């Protein structure tokens, strides 16, 4: 893959994409799970026939490539994210998951290279979350141009456009465009396995099978180079060169208390432990306290004795 994007044209492969992470954008989240489902455009141009009365969820195409991975995030998951996704740093460590590293980035590239080009990543709310987060993870590895050969579209934007085109004069309450709401609106049921990366990808594919030919035309006209996506948050040079901790190391660090003593050779902050004084100084300080008290008592006795001598006898 070169640094230049391929010329615009019919997208040959749509890669439905979703990520779960440790939290919302303001918290600089890290990926905990990702899934990519590659579908050739011919599978959408000639969709399989649904079985049963409408609305029936269409079956996925027979020929797909899928990559699904859980990832050690290297930081704690927010309680809300853990409750929604069922993933936490401790759970991922217990299963020996690895961080988002060069190996994972190369795996993503190898997966993409197996697909007919041009490719287009399709993610729900991708412009605001999945795409910038993926760019941030790649930037941590110094690979901001790794996906310059790919294109991308946000399925929310696409589905809004398709709904407006099909019913331009429709009035009524404002519709929700969350993945679950659209799925329920189309098929009369909740999507299975919500808030798992694979479950959300399959739900998105089913939604895009609603009007596949119209979707393909919209994607061909509006896909933009993935290289135009800015990372969700800035990455410093030191962060790029700093080794990423393993899941086991991260979990052990999160579990330790703040007053745990460092091991030999480790450098802790200056606020963690008070400076160690010279043993001789400690012994001198221990002697000075009783000597000072003895001096005060001696002075008091001498004063009383002097007063007794100055007082006339009976």
Swiss-Prot record:
The active site is at residue 195. Signal peptide: none annotated. Changing residue 160 to R: Reduces ubiquitination. The modification Phosphoserine is found at residues 78, 167, 261. Changing residue 242 to R: Reduces ubiquitination. It is a peripheral membrane protein. Residues 236-314 are annotated as: Necessary for endoplasmic reticulum localization. Substrate binds at residues 20-21, 129, 200. Its main location: nucleus. Changing residue 303 to P: In AGS1; decreases ubiquitination levels; decreases colocalization with UBQLN1; no effect on exonuclease activity. Residues 247-260 have a biased composition (Low complexity). Its EC number is 3.1.11.2. Residues 240-278 are annotated as: Disordered. One of its GO terms (biological process) is regulation of lipid biosynthetic process. It catalyses: Exonucleolytic cleavage in the 3'- to 5'-direction to yield nucleoside 5'-phosphates. GO terms for cellular component: cytoplasm; cytosol; endoplasmic reticulum membrane; nuclear envelope; nuclear replication fork; oligosaccharyltransferase complex; protein-DNA complex. It is an enzyme of class 3 (hydrolase). Changing residue 290 to L: In SLE; increases ubiquitination levels; no effect on exonuclease activity. Detected in thymus, spleen, liver, brain, heart, small intestine and colon. Changing residue 305 to C: In SLE; decreases ubiquitination levels; decreases colocalization with UBQLN1; no effect on exonuclease activity. Belongs to the exonuclease superfamily. TREX family. Homodimer. Interacts (via proline-rich region) with TCERG1/CA150 (via the second WW domain). Component of the SET complex, composed of at least ANP32A, APEX1, HMGB2, NME1, SET and TREX1. Within this complex, directly interacts with SET; this interaction does not result in TREX1 inhibition. Also interacts with NME1, but only following translocation to the nucleus. Directly interacts with UBQLN1 (via ubiquitin-like domain); the interaction may control TREX1 subcellular location. This is Three-prime repair exonuclease 1. The gene is TREX1.
């Amino acid at each position: 893959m070169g640094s230049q994007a391929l010329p615009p044209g019919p997208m040959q492969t749509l890669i439905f994409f979703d990520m779960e992470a440790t939290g919302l954008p303001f918290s600089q989240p890290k990926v905990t799970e990702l899934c990519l489902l590659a579908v050739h455009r011919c599978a959408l141009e000639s969709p399989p026939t649904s079985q049963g009365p409408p609305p029936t969820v269409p079956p996925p195409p027979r020929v797909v490539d899928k990559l699904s991975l859980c990832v050690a995030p290297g930081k704690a998951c927010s309680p809300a994210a853990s409750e929604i996704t069922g993933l936490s740093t401790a759970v991922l460590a217990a299963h020996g998951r690895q961080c988002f590293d060069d190996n994972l980035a190369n795996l993503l590239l190898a997966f993409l290279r197996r697909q007919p080009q041009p490719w287009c990543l399709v993610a729900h709310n991708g412009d605001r979350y999945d795409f910038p987060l993926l760019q941030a993870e790649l930037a941590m590895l110094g690979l901001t141009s790794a996906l310059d050969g790919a294109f991308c579209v946000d399925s929310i934007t696409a589905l809004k456009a398709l709904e407006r085109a099909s019913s331009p004069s429709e009035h009524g309450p404002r519709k929700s465009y969350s993945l679950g709401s659209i799925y329920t609106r189309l098929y009369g049921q909740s999507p299975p396995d919500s808030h798992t990366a694979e479950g959300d990808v399959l739900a998105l594919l089913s939604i895009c099978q609603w009007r596949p030919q119209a979707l393909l035309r919209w994607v061909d006209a509006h896909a933009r180079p993935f290289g135009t996506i800015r990372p969700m948050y800035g990455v410093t040079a030191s962060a790029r060169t700093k080794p990423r901790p393993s899941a086991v190391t991260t979990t052990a660090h999160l579990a330790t208390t703040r007053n745990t003593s460092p091991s030999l050779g480790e450098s802790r902050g200056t606020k963690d432990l008070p400076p160690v004084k010279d043993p001789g100084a400690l012994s001198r300080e221990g002697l000075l306290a009783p000597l000072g008290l003895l001096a005060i008592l001696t002075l008091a006795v001498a004063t009383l004795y002097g007063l007794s001598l100055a007082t006339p006898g009976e």
